[in-house]
Amino acid sequence: MVNYPHKLTSKNNIKKVKKETVDFANRGMTFEKMINDTNDYYLSRGLAVIHKKPTPVQIVKVDYPKRSRAKIVEAYFRQASTTDYSGVYRGHYIDFEAKETRQKQSMPMKNFHAHQIEHMNQVLNQGGICFVLLHFSSLKETYLLPAPYLIEFYKIDKGGKSMPLDYIQKHGYLIEQNILPSVPYLDIISKNLLGGHSNE
């Protein structure tokens, strides 16, 4: 080691540059939070009871580094999840999936799986209201697409390509984002799927 005047070493003069890491796994968390906040708003005003479904997980191994702490080190999905949210609105069962993309012209169909499409079909067959919320983060636009149009496109596309934005705009509804509720999707359901009036 080279000694410098006043016993400074060379390492004292080197600035450490911290590399920023991007967590791609949490890319959709902002949109999810917007939906959760919207659902909390609806619940607090007695408009609807809609919650995010828990993901079914089987815990296999747990470590206990301290008595008061437990750390899950191995877990598996018990079964394929269906859709993200479900609940009740004005006596109607509501069931929907939420997807986000940075693409500007289409929504990747690889985001949808056969078991989800089948589940949506089953909900519709029972008279439930089923749809997808599609958020284009680059455009700052969110659409509500009724499940029949997603199912129809999925059957043609076989889940392989992407759903064009113009298809979504033709068959879906643009949701005007708000401060609270952030994603007022119940207004779309009320006006266009139930033929009623807005909640606001």
Swiss-Prot record:
EC number(s) from the headed UniProt entry: 3.1.21.10
Chain ranges passing through the membrane: none
Gene3D superfamilies per record: 3.40.1350.10
Residues that coordinate or bind Mg(2+): 82, 84, 97, 116
Site positions per UniProt: Transition state stabilizer: 99
One GO CC term, this protein: cytoplasm
Main location group: cytoplasm
SUPFAM superfamilies: Restriction endonuclease-like (SSF52980)
Cofactor note: Binds 1 Mg(2+) ion per subunit.
Cofactor(s) it depends on: Mg(2+)
MF terms (GO), sorted A to Z: endonuclease activity; magnesium ion binding; nucleic acid binding
Pfam (any one): RecU
InterPro entries: Resolv_RecU, Restrct_endonuc-II-like, tRNA_endonuc-like_dom_sf
Keyword terms of this UniProt record: Cytoplasm, DNA damage, DNA recombination, DNA repair, Endonuclease, Hydrolase, Magnesium, Metal-binding, Nuclease
Function, as annotated: Endonuclease that resolves Holliday junction intermediates in genetic recombination. Cleaves mobile four-strand junctions by introducing symmetrical nicks in paired strands. Promotes annealing of linear ssDNA with homologous dsDNA. Required for DNA repair, homologous recombination and chromosome segregation.
Family classification: Belongs to the RecU family.
Protein name stated in the entry: Holliday junction resolvase RecU
